[in-house]
């Protein structure tokens, strides 16, 4: 591997689920050059690329599909805040989650629905009230521990949160 390949691989290893623009900022490479090297790394199976609507995320090859789902959620501020609130205190009601993450009910609803759809959070009925519970607790705990500096302490702006909603 040449120096650029090593640099890109290091960036992706340290920041699983990173998007193209973030890699471009971190590496200092221009769009076309970066695209060429990432395509080459993907073709040789050195990195894993998951393409979704309006976004492409890059992962080390050992990351599983379940892990990539958790990492995708942890890389966005609001879903990360929701998961951390549920880790701190399990079985919260919707209104409690709204207070915890300090976002509007519609924003919390949007991201909570996505977390439920991704099977990271489940809804339980307790005393006829909906309560939210982390479904993949062990996996989330493991990934937070493994990638804490890069995923959890990396600031994301509200604007990026809106743009990268899904």
Which residue ranges define each predicted feature?
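Short capping segments at the starts of secondary-structure elements
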Residues: 15-19, 77, 89-93
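Short amphipathic alpha-helical interaction segments
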Residues: 29-40, 102-117
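A short acidic, leucine-rich amphipathic alpha-helix
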Residues: 22-26, 96-101
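Short alpha-helical segments that sit at the start of domains
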Residues: 1-7, 54-80
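Long, low-complexity, charged/polar intrinsically disordered regions in eukaryotic proteins
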Residues: 20-25, 29-68
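Long, low-complexity, charge-rich intrinsically disordered regions
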Residues: 1-2, 6-14, 80-88, 105, ...
């Amino acid at each position: 591997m040449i120096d650029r390949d090593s640099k890109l691989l290091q960036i992706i290893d340290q920041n699983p689920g990173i998007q193209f623009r973030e890699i471009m900022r971190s590496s200092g490479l221009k769009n076309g050059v970066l695209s060429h090297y990432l395509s080459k790394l993907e073709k040789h199976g050195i990195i894993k690329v998951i393409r979704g609507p309006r976004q492409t995320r890059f992962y080390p090859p050992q990351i599983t599909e379940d892990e990539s789902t958790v990492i995708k959620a942890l890389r966005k501020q609001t879903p990360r805040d929701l998961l951390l609130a549920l880790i701190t205190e399990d079985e919260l009601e919707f209104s409690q989650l709204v207070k915890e993450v300090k976002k509007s009910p519609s924003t919390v609803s949007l991201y909570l629905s996505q977390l439920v759809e991704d099977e990271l959070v489940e809804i339980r009925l307790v005393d006829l009230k909906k309560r939210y519970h982390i479904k993949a607790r062990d996996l989330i705990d493991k990934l937070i521990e493994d990638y804490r500096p890069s995923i959890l302490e990396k600031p994301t702006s509200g604007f990026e949160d809106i743009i990268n909603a899904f």
